Regions:
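Conserved phosphate- and dinucleotide-binding cores of soluble alpha/beta proteins
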Residues: 79-177
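N-terminal active-site beta-alpha-beta segment that forms phosphate/nucleotide-binding
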Residues: 1-111
């Protein structure tokens, strides 16, 4: 199946989720994520703020701040994405494509070992990922390739196999619920 068709099908499944289903899966993923060695060992989390029916990440990012970890979330500048440090997850506003992002343009996060949480539409057991089509994470990780990466998704987003392209960068770990 081509990426356009796959993206459309997954978006339709996400739109069909009830708020209760999103909350239940997000709570399970939060607990699972906070129990991982990746989380426990990370000093810095490059997270993301949820958009539409994405996994709700705010509780995990708030816990990371409470646990003394540094947290940054992405902000888009044209076709590039940079992570901006955030101490307060309320200091955000709709940005690129109405996705929540920091109001401030700085300070720009600069931890090459930060754990990067990645959204996406579809994943497979080999870590292949189909994103939303902007290429923001692929470009970021091509420029900063040493980050450990972890994707969060719903069970229907986990597929047996995805066709990928040369520029697609796989994730190290995928958690789903």
């Amino acid at each position: 199946m081509d990426k356009i068709t796959l993206r459309k099908q997954i978006r339709e499944k996400k739109r069909a989720m009830t708020p209760e289903e999103i909350t239940a899966a997000s709570e399970k993923l939060t607990a699972n994520f906070l129990a991982t060695d990746l989380y426990r060992q990370a000093k810095t989390i490059y997270g993301y703020l949820p958009y539409n029916q994405e996994v709700r990440t705010v509780a995990m990012l708030e816990q990371a701040i409470l646990d003394g970890k540094r947290v940054a979330v992405p902000k888009c500048y044209g076709d590039e994405m940079r992570f901006i440090w955030l101490d307060d997850l309320t200091q955000v506003a709709p940005g690129y494509a109405n996705i929540p992002e920091p109001i401030a343009d700085e300070p720009i996060a600069d931890d090459p070992s930060a754990l990067v949480l990645m959204p996406g539409l579809a994943f497979d057991p080999q870590g292949h990922r189909i994103g939303y089509g902007g290429g923001f994470y692929d470009k970021f990780l091509a420029a900063e390739p040493n980050h450990p990466t972890l994707a969060l998704c719903y069970d229907f987003q986990m597929l047996d196999h995805l066709e990928t392209e040369e520029h697609d960068i796989p994730v190290d770990t995928v958690l789903w619920a």
